[in-house]
A protein has these predicted regions:
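FIC/Doc superfamily catalytic core
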Residues: 1-326
Length: 326
């Protein structure tokens, strides 16, 4: 798809009545969040707390149940806790700490909320690879997956197992999930499945290029961009595993970069973790490739972002009151 065609398609989606209304509601909620009293001086702490809560929510989507307080204690333990590229030998902990590391990295790329510092963000392909290494690296160190699938888009000839998508991820469902995490059985690669048809060859390469173009093309409608990038990560599945996790990380990154949530304190993973059935249903709707399905997905993404902003407002008040660890 040419750049002009991509822009035209995104603008057409943004003009759809339901999408336009959802976008307006998001900007109103974002403005309210931006002027939270706590964010005047303690926005750094709020962003850090959002990273903890996002990691916990994201881990739950991946089938790993970890408490926020337990993760905070791991982080406080320093390099031997959540901060190093090591394995705890517990896949649930490795998933949670990997997600926290990736979210913390994203915070480092965010502009100051008060001030003029604007860190340099890596090129999109490098950013995606780095975030994927953060998430999947501990699983490779622990021997659960091959290091060859970490940080690298899958080879075009690799076909994905067309497993049903139920909103879960790389740790969901025991053996089936470990197979989905890139393990081998009888010498054959068993990789992550998801909604939509399996892709390979030139089609896979073109769709990955389209994801990068969606991220890089300037002046696209923010809600439409965020929603499409997330959905394409779920349906194209350019990596062997953790595509959903990477998609949700990109949601946070793009929401801040494009001004949808300049605070960086939203927890947009929360909604998908609490209502996984709706997440799966919306992803399947998008994979249908119908206009109604795509719009339904964008509306779901808007709902997730709105709930994430509500969570951001709550955690900002908790940071101000000093009650985040209760």
């Amino acid at each position: 798809m040419s750049t002009n065609a991509l822009i035209d398609a995104c603008l057409a989606l943004a003009r759809e009545e339901r999408v336009a209304a959802a976008s307006e509601a998001l900007y109103e909620a974002s403005a309210q969040l931006r002027w939270q009293e706590a964010l005047r001086k303690r926005w750094r702490e709020a962003r850090a707390e959002a990273s903890v809560r996002a990691a916990v929510s994201g881990a739950a989507i991946e089938g790993a149940v970890v408490s926020a307080q337990a993760l905070r204690e791991q982080i406080a333990a320093g390099p031997k806790g959540a901060g190093a590229h090591t394995s705890s030998k517990d896949p649930a902990w490795d998933a949670a700490t990997g997600l926290w590391r990736a979210h913390s990295r994203l915070v480092g790329y965010m502009p100051d909320l008060v001030g003029r510092t604007r860190p340099v963000v890596p090129a999109t392909a490098q950013l995606m690879a780095t975030l994927h290494r953060d998430v999947a690296g501990p699983l490779a160190v622990g021997g659960l997956i091959s290091e060859a699938v970490v940080g690298c888009p899958r080879e075009s000839e690799q076909a994905l197992e067309n497993q049903s998508f139920e909103g879960g991820g790389m740790l969901e469902g025991g053996k089936a999930a470990l197979e989905g995490a890139g393990l081998r059985e009888n010498g054959n690669p068993l990789l992550e499945g998801g909604p939509g048809p399996n892709l390979g060859g030139q089609e896979l390469r073109e769709r990955l290029e389209q994801i990068v173009a969606l991220i890089d093309t300037p002046n696209l409608p923010a809600l439409v961009r965020v929603a499409l990038v997330h959905a394409e990560m779920l349906t194209v599945r350019p990596f062997a595993l953790a595509n959903g996790a990477l998609g949700r990380l990109l949601v946070r990154h793009l929401s801040v970069r494009d001004g949808l949530d300049p605070t960086g304190v939203s927890v947009s993973d929360y909604y998908a973790g609490r209502v996984p059935g709706a997440y799966a249903e919306a992803a399947q709707a998008y994979a249908s490739a119908s206009l109604e399905g795509v719009v339904a997905w964008i509306i779901w993404q808007a709902e997730a972002l709105l709930e994430g902003m509500r969570q951001g407002s709550e955690l900002s008040r908790a940071v101000q009151a000093g009650t985040t660890q209760r």
